[in-house]
Swiss-Prot record:
Lineage: Bacteria, Pseudomonadati, Pseudomonadota, Gammaproteobacteria, Pasteurellales
Organism expressing this protein natively: Actinobacillus pleuropneumoniae serotype 5b (strain L20)
Function: Involved in iron-sulfur (Fe-S) cluster assembly. May act as a regulator of Fe-S biogenesis.
Name by which UniProt lists this protein: Iron-sulfur cluster assembly protein CyaY
NCBIfam families attached to this UniProt entry: FeS_CyaY
SMART domains: Frataxin_Cyay
Keyword rRNA-binding in record: no
GO biological process, one term: iron-sulfur cluster assembly
Protein family: Belongs to the frataxin family.
Domain of life per record: Bacteria
Amino acid sequence: MNVAEFHQKVEQVWQQIEEKIDDEALSIDTEIHGAVCTLTFDDESQIIINKQEAMLELWLASKLGGFHFAFRDGEWVTAEGRSFWTHLEEAFARHGEQISF
């Protein structure tokens, strides 16, 4: 994957997240600035998803900790093979919201 494809794939993830939050009418503020997508919950807690261009990775930070994802076989996964979407759903739950991607 080249850098342009990387950015396109991450931006698709961000778009999916925004659309799902809107579809579910969740009270979560979504802000994207440069390489960082910030999801802010009612209690002011946050999930941060950012691009790591040099490594072609997607990073996720939440109350559960920090995780790194590489794009393999058509999906974002950790080195252990856990899906980005699984981690994100668990992070939402930890922040008090139920969502399914």
